[in-house]
């Protein structure tokens, strides 16, 4: 088969006559930045031939496109097909090869590429969000496709791990003469591109670097969130010990940040705070205003897990029925969503699985902040959000913190530094800012 080593297409924004752009991409890493909701995933679907007949804000005419295409999806769970890590690594190889010796050799090489130790019989669902993203990247490149399209699929990774994975990607595309098109909501990712573009609702244009904006700063008043961890140990069965005799004390926090490398135990610590999991030994206790049992709500890094296939409308009605949401705040909650470009009437009766991830995440944050909980725990709240959307979320949560308390679990150190007054670091990837109280974990 004749190899096409160029991706050439014209994008035409139909509601803006004359606003079209021709894009020519040759082997290398190319980055398109865009805020959530501008059409990044729609562009992926157009390029891969999976776009439906529903209207969008642009049309695409593809003039040249490689034959062998691999897509890496935004939600890492959507790409995992096997019930073991070994099976996941071998799946693509077995679909594309018949030589068992070659499959075994490549499989072992892929296993070596994982930057974390694994038990091959472990279920992929037990990996952290970032570890799943790494797994999907490795399997996507395993069959040496000519074009790899990455749909905001590195947003769970901290800076150090993201740089490490991108260097591995650069090595592969140089060796195999591949085109990698990476669509991202993180403006910092533009630094990695051989060509850099910005997608908006009205245009796709080459990105012009400028001075990076900064988050608006607001000093938080002292809070009453206290966390005591005393000689706590915990591990998942047959896996490495995440916490070994860990000790930590947090006093009078208004907003507590939990940061750390991918797989360091951030989400697991949240499950221990919530009582979903329990320490193997030692103790962990959270108090608020002297209350040993504050009411808490947790928004998972995979937000659809909060309601499953149910709808946001039903969730609101449940909160109303149990008294967690007051009737007079119901309308205000919907108004706040509308201000954040969330069209309530369009999503209210949709299954959570049919709502774009970032939209679902923001909608759930708005709902939970209008309910009567003493403490919110937000796991990766900025995932998939562009710079302006992060600023809007920051300012919204800063207003919420005048009365309430939150715990923010995130790899997004810059966001954590600006929304939290105390930060617990689960590894040595330290935060350096004079305005924060930083607490390092202490394990024996």
Which residues are covered by each model-predicted region?
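ABC-family nucleotide-binding domains
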Residues: 151, 158, 379, 385-386
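Conserved H-loop
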Residues: 177-185, 404-410
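Conserved beta-strand-loop-alpha-helix hinge in the C-terminal portion
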Residues: 191, 198-222, 428-444
């Amino acid at each position: 088969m004749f190899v096409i080593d160029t991706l050439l297409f014209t994008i035409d924004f139909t509601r803006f006559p004359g606003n079209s752009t021709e894009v020519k991409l040759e082997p290398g890493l190319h980055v398109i930045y865009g805020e959530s909701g501008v059409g990044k995933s729609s562009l992926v679907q157009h390029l891969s031939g999976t776009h439906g007949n529903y209207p969008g804000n642009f049309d695409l005419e593809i003039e040249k496109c490689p034959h062998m295409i691999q897509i890496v999806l935004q939600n890492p769970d959507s790409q995992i097909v096997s019930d073991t890590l070994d099976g996941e690594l071998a799946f693509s190889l077995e679909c594309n090869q018949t030589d068992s010796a070659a499959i075994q050799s490549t499989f072992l090489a892929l296993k070596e590429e994982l930057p974390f130790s694994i038990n091959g019989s472990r279920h992929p669902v037990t990996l952290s969000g970032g570890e799943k993203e790494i797994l999907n990247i490795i399997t996507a490149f395993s069959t040496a496709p000519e074009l790899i399209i990455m749909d905001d699929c590195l947003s769970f990774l901290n800076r150090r791990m993201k740089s490490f994975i991108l260097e591995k990607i650069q090595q592969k595309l140089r060796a195999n003469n591949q085109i990698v098109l990476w669509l991202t909501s993180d403006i910092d990712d533009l630094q990695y591109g051989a060509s850099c573009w910005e997608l908006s609702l009205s245009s796709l244009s080459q990105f012009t670097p400028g001075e990076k904006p900064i988050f608006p700063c607001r000093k938080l008043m002292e809070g009453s969130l206290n966390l005591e961890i005393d000689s706590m140990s915990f591990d998942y069965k047959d896996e490495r010990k995440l916490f070994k005799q860990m000790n930590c004390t947090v006093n009078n926090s208004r907003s507590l940040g939990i940061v750390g490398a991918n797989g360091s135990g951030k989400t697991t610590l949240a499950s221990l705070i919530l009582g979903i999991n329990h320490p193997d030994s030692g103790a962990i206790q959270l108090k608020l205003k002297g209350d040993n049992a504050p009411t808490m709500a947790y928004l998972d890094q995979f937000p659809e897990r909060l309601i499953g296939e149910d709808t946001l409308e039903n969730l609101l009605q449940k909160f109303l029925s149990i008294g967690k949401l007051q009737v007079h705040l119901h309308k205000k909650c919907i108004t706040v969503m509308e201000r954040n470009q969330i069209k309530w009437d369009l999503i209210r009766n949709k299954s959570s699985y049919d709502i774009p991830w970032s939209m679902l995440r923001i909608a759930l944050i708005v709902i939970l902040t209008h309910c009567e909980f003493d403490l919110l725990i937000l796991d990766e709240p900025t995932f998939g959000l562009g710079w302006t959307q992060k600023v809007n979320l920051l300012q919204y949560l800063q207003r919420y913190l005048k009365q309430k308390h939150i715990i923010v679990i995130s790899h997004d150190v810059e966001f954590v530094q600006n929304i939290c007054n105390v930060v617990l670091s689960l590894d040595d990837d330290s935060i350096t800012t004079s305005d924060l109280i930083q607490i390092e974990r202490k394990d024996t």
